[in-house]
């Protein structure tokens, strides 16, 4: 394994307009990864924690408290949609820039894909999940945050599982 030759720590301010549509989010992610263009491989880019959280709040129109009263399942539907957009955009970006991508995190139940069932979640609990992609855009790991800060105590803690991932540059 050769070490990563290009490392990019993305610094980004979260502004609602970057999260209102899938297209706006895609443009933002690609703009933030632009410094990777023309750099030597293997590349690793890391987004800040909770980079994906505003998708839950702003995607397809803001989350109105009144809507929550009318529809208690709304957070789960919104999380599923936000997770889908986050996953697709980040996978596409990993492929486009040929980079391993640690895609910040979002609050969501952890989803899995199966051919027969499509996308489903084994647990209804929200976790602070970081997604890790390879340069082909494949999701290698969903890593739940281990140590929760006090406001996050209502989230389900991540159990420590097989979160070491083999890359061209060794284990991450």
Which residues fall in each region the model found?
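Active-site-proximal beta-strand elements of phosphoester/diester hydrolases
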Residues: 3-22, 129, 142-145, 170-172
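Active-site beta-strand/loop signature of hydrolases that rely on acidic residues for catalysis
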Residues: 7, 30-63, 68, 72, ...
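Catalytic metal-binding/acid-base residues of hydrolase active sites
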Residues: 13, 51, 106-107
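Short catalytic/ligand-binding loop motif for oxyanion handling, primarily in non-cytosolic enzymes
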Residues: 17, 53-56, 109-113
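Transmembrane beta-barrel domains of bacterial outer-membrane proteins
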Residues: 22, 28-29
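A short acidic, glycine-rich active-site loop
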Residues: 67-88
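A short, hydrophobic beta-strand-centered structural micro-motif
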Residues: 83-111
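Active-site catalytic loop in hydrolytic enzyme cores
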Residues: 109-172
